[in-house]
Design a protein with these regions (language model features):
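C-terminal motif of bacterial Sec signal peptides marking the signal peptidase cleavage site
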Residues: 16-19
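Bacterial signal peptide processing site
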Residues: 21-24
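Structural beta-strand segments of beta-rich domains
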Residues: 30-34, 137-141
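A short, amphipathic beta-strand motif
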Residues: 32-41, 80
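Short, ordered, surface-exposed loop/turn motifs in non-cytosolic proteins
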Residues: 43-67, 152-157
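Short, acidic Ser/Thr/Gly-rich low-complexity loop/linker segments typical of extracellular
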Residues: 63-79
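A short, solvent-exposed beta-strand micro-motif common in secreted/extracellular proteins
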Residues: 80-84, 90-101
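Structured interaction patches on ligand/partner-binding surfaces of diverse proteins
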Residues: 98-125
Length: 179
């Protein structure tokens, strides 16, 4: 009985090994990629993004002229840059979704190797911050917060900080100011 089980297991193992060496996957690995920055259309400054992760800005690549309906998704970084290094060469529409900007943020790119594509849009607001630290380690903050569009209204401005990079409202210390 053991001999039959051993022969069966050996045959099963041989089938698994042969299955791993077939030519079913006949596509070469992706040979292109995209990288770039999302800029403020009016100031040419990078637009800060939410912390990457489940709450970060989703970047989506839609392949054009192939009938493909699914997108290739990845996240933008907090400094407004983005990168995906494993994309097939071809024509794509790239879109930033659910970001801190007004309207649609998208562009078109022909990927041929590692390709740079920068996107330009209008942010919801422009916030400048000046921080000074006194000799006794006290912070003085001066900020200016303006909306980019008269129809938008700022209702709350918060200063948040953390000891590690990647601060957001879920992992920060807060100081809220009324305007």
């Amino acid at each position: 009985m053991n001999k039959i089980i051993n022969i069966g297991l050996t045959a099963l193992f041989a089938c698994f090994m042969v299955a791993c060496e077939n030519d079913i996957d006949n596509y070469d690995a992706p040979n292109g990629g995209v990288h770039g920055t999302i800029y403020d259309k009016e100031t040419n400054e990078p637009i800060p993004m939410p912390v990457p992760g489940s709450s970060g800005v989703m970047m989506s690549l839609y392949e054009q002229n192939t009938g493909a309906t699914a997108s290739v998704d990845f996240r933008a970084r907090q400094d407004g840059t983005f990168e995906h290094t494993k994309v097939f060469n071809g024509n794509y529409r790239i879109q930033a979704k659910d970001g801190p900007f007004v309207g649609v943020c998208e562009g078109y790119v022909t990927v041929n190797g590692q390709t740079q594509v920068d996107l330009y849009t209008i942010p919801f607001s422009r916030i400048s911050l000046d921080v000074t630290v006194s000799a006794d380690n006290k912070l003085t903050l001066t900020y200016d917060a303006k909306t980019s569009n008269e129809t938008l209204q700022l209702t709350d401005v918060s200063v948040i900080w953390n000891y590690a990079p990647g601060v957001d409202v879920n992992n920060a210390n807060h100081a809220t100011f009324s305007s």
